[in-house]
Amino acid sequence: MGGPGGMPDLNQLFGQIQAMMQPYDGPLNWDVALDTARKAVAQQPDPSPTQRQKDAVADAVRLADHWLDDTTAFPSGVTSTAAWSRAEWLVGTVEVWKVLVEPVAKQTVDSLSSALPEEARAASGPLLGIIGKAVGVMLASQVGSGLGALASEVLTASDVGLPLGAAGRAALVPANVEAFAAGLDVSTDDVLLYLALREAAHQRLFAHVPWLREHLLGAVTAYARGIEINAEAIQSRIEEQMRGVDPTDPESMQRLLEGGLFDMPKSPAQEAALLRLETTLALVEGWVDEVVGQATAERMPAAAKMQEAVRRRRAAGGPAEDTFASLVGLELRPRRLRDASTLWGSLRTRQGTEARDGVWMHPDLLPSAADLDDPLGFREDAAAPAEISESDFDAELAKLLDGDLPDGDQPGDQPGDQPGDQPGDQPGDQPGDGPTPA
């Protein structure tokens, strides 16, 4: 922050001080965050979508929903469509970002206050409140920069795998879609339709799996809150970083927040929440990848190229996702998308569409991270048994009636009995023992 000749930029300095003094609720000043995000978006042209673009999005989503009817047991979850500018994406998703960001903001403000020595807290008095407000404004500036960067890249409302928009609203960002299409050897219409298929598939899943939205957002907030965090380790880290920080100097406060404040050792609870989030994100994205692949297999020649482009984009992330990862402390990208897509496809091949989609009935039924290690083996033992001929059935029945049972089992044996046990034997009896007297 500086003006001509190395002099401070007084307008910017006074603007920061004024923002700190403005009252706001919660741990983060969202007015500052949104203002920062809008300014970041305004650095490049951001025209409002034309009526033609709005109609194109609506038509693409309508066709996408029709194609998806043949590939999933879930009915349409789309109740409205929208073509957003980048600024409109900010407005349309900010309420969910508040849910995601505020826990980590509150943790940060509280940790900074508690990191001060007891004597310093007693001597600071009202200054502690000012420090908290200053940190809230600095965090808001970082959040705004991160959201502004994301707004310049996102393609749809569900592009990061989380339900960021209103329930049932399928939204695309035409300006970003066109920029994405420019780097592919695929027509813009095909790119729009493919992305509409993905958006409509997300909407179906979130609409008809009622627990999924809270499950995903809950994993994010559980991570952000740092459940069972090592308070001593964090306090030591913050105390180390706060040495030399002048609460009256906005630049020193900014350096504190940019100096790896969020790069702290993860607690076991945070590691568990992160694994749950990454696995569920991969399962959501893998399911979308699978059903869209089915829907386009015989209808869209460019689908394979689009699928690979989207997979690479989601797996690698970009500058915007890196910015947000450094801000919140986690990455919203499905690292195991390919494994998850393979798992869903294998389950459909063996047991059918309804069995594949039925896994979403309850979170306890979802594949685990270990299941993604062997995607072809998920529920392998639940595959439909091979048909048996009438003659084979008669032969097996004859063996049973003749007492020709495998391994020396006797009629009336219970699961876990040893060969040669007598009816009524108790666990631990020796072979040949009779019933244990009462």
Per-range role (PLM):
Residues 262-438:
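Pan-zinc metallopeptidase signature
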Residues 190-210, 344:
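Active-site recognition of the HExxH zinc-binding catalytic motif
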Residues 177-195:
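Short pre-active-site segment immediately N-terminal to the catalytic Zn-binding motif
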Residues 137-158, 206-258, 272-299:
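Post-HExxH zinc-binding segment in Zn-dependent metallohydrolases
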